Amino acid sequence: MDAFLETSLTASKYVLIILSVCIIVRCIRSMLSERYESEVWAYIRLGREILPVNHWENIIGRSRGADIRVDQPGVGRVHAVLKRSDRGIWTIYDVFSRGGVWVNGTKVGSRGINLETGDVINLAGTCVRFQDITTEKREKLESARTSAGKRVSPFMTLFELTVFQLFLLLQHAISAHANHLPNIVLGFVLLIILEWTCYNAMRLMSRSGFEAETLAFYLTTLGMSVAASSTPADMFKQILLTIAAVLLFLLCGAWLRNLKRTAMMRDPVAVLALLLLAVNVLASDAVFGARNWLELGGYSFQPSELVKAAYIYVGASTLDRLYRKRNLFGFIAFSAVCVIALALIGDFGTALIFFVSFLVISFMRSGSIATVFLAVTGAGLAGFLAISVKPYIAQRFASWGHVWEDVYGAGFQQTRAMSAAASGGLFGKGAGSGWLKDIFAANTDMVFAVICEEQGLIIAICMVLAVLTLAFFAVRSARHGRSAYYSIAACAAMSMLMVQMGLNVFGSLDILPFTGVTFPFVSRGGSSLLSCWMLLAFIKGADTRRDASFVVRPVRKIEEYHVGYDAETDDYDYGDDGTEEDEP
């Protein structure tokens, strides 16, 4: 019997590796290798040249990076913003241009001017004509685009993931104690039901792009395996948190579908995030030098994890708000308060993640390398000050690169992590068969090493590739997002997950200082899991492939323009007095 179990365990290792590679390769093929076909919403006619309008928010200017490039004398690098509302109403705004913007002879003021088909737009002497497209034309263009999942079936990829989960469950059935086996089986069965329920819900919505969710479920499965190895008695709690995380992902995605509603709630979300951090600063107790945990009804959670999603929600911006100084200064102030609060509670790993996201958002807002350089310089000085006043942080930096010199002190965790990772080899020891899981914080801060030990280096690399695939997909999708809000949010969300992964992997291997941050979707912890699934909703918001994302509204009939309609026109002030002037 023992020989049969040993043979089954060995065979399952190879099957898991093959399935992992297949899942990652199929997702890469579907998300990154297929040609991205942009949406077309209108046209701008410049003489005989016809320029497609591919987004709901477009920069018009002379810059090479402009969405609608008009390379003519007098036209500024960033001259105007052309925006489409959720109701199909197009509005043009003047963005600090020197030559001004006129529509049919009327100067564009601070509130912008609504456009209709055939309107002539004067950009500092260069005239272009706006041409909206009919519903029939739009539907024809949309039907010509390739549907997501047509070349690589999401059903087969999810089926492979299900087989992967069953073989992983087999390994736990071999290694787990009999008392814990029912909890482990229940956890994996409910996870399989959850992912197929989510898939079928998307199919009912005529959505065929399920690659990002599949990668998230793949990572969550590995996290479930770590929980089954380290804390099998808490498996039911872990699956409940997973269900809550997926539901929160669906709710966030549904909320993001309405861009105007999303933008209107940025200030309330910012206030809520600051209140959470304030409670964290005032009410939490220090644990190993940090005060980042709150106790509520017998359960502990990290407010900073939930604030991650709020930070991106507040930091992203639509194009018409992007150039407002008040909006930019407000975001900088919000970022400063968040980082200071994280410093006060001693969560410098999360503070670093926030800072990198701040750099990404700042660069996408301004496009200025100088701004990023100044921010990095200021952060370097702040980091030096933190090391000076926080002894436990200084100790971590002192042991960085020297953990083998103090294997029973400052280097205790990293030396064990590296030893366990090396002992797993390429194929691992099998789920639940390692010893690192018994070390403090192994299932959170050193989870990469736990996967290396139990599942082998190949699956650990697949785990990293899953996050990298999401990252490249987010950047690729951002170029085609309907709104700058979705593009900025997707890139910022992915920067958080990337930095989080890098700090976890390289920190546990002593390549970077050990900061104690979690691996996205994999590390045990409800707060982290909730946060990661919420961030995934931002990535889905930028995915404009045909029938791909439930966050993106399908192409539908545009309602008729309303004479004097004002509710959809945003009352933004760009510095001029809004008075009419004669056309040049």
Residue ranges and their predicted role:
Residues 51-127:
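Forkhead-associated
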Residues 143-288, 530-556:
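A structural signal for hydrophobic alpha-helical transmembrane segments in multi-pass membrane proteins
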Residues 287, 291-293, 300, 373-463, ...:
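Hydrophobic, glycine- and aromatic-enriched re-entrant/interface helices and adjoining loop segments
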Residues 325-344, 348-388:
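Hydrophobic alpha-helical segments of polytopic membrane proteins
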Residues 475-516, 522:
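Loop-to-helix entry and N-terminal half of a specific, functionally important transmembrane alpha helix
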Residues 504-584:
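A juxtamembrane structural motif centered on a specific transmembrane helix
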